[in-house]
Amino acid sequence: MHLCYFDENKHGPDNPHFFIGGLLIPDKKALDFENTLSQIAFNFFGARSLIQANELHGKELFHGKGNAKGRKLEERVQVFQDIATFVTNNQIPVRMVCINVERHKNKYQYPMPAYRLGLMLILERFSEYLEQEDDLGLVFGDYEADEVTGAVVDFSEYKSQGKTPMYFGRPLAGYGVFHPVASQPIFTGGRFAGLHGGSL
């Protein structure tokens, strides 16, 4: 089984691209990976406690705000480097979706909301990987009060239909520390591409 963690950014006039993406963690390696991430958090925060104050979120680290406020740039960059090394060395699959929200709205007469479209597409990408690996997956995401109800309905519909409703129509079979880390590829991917995906 793979544990599939996803996160998304907040889009708006200053940030027109909606990013959603995540990591697929093999369950057999989850505890070892958690220990590594706890060490990275300890190196930065001086604590291993699984509390919000010790979460490694891309936005706060990049801007030096929130729980990274007052920390030196070199220290914050080191966390990004450590996470990138961790993901790369462990060959952790990363999947991302980027939607230009205005272009999407203008392309269709009745466009699907960006969050629902992005959720559908990231589930398709997770499913595609799991199918290649001949494995099952368990998906974890944020509790977004304004969007969670629709997302739960989407999950339910995708499950009952056995696949997502459009685009690739990929089949969706059966149905702590990794989720904040899932925000980092989204944040850095958007920044690297110059598409301002960094407002997680």
Positions of predicted regions on the chain:
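Phosphate-ester processing/binding pockets and catalytic centers
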Residues: 1-200
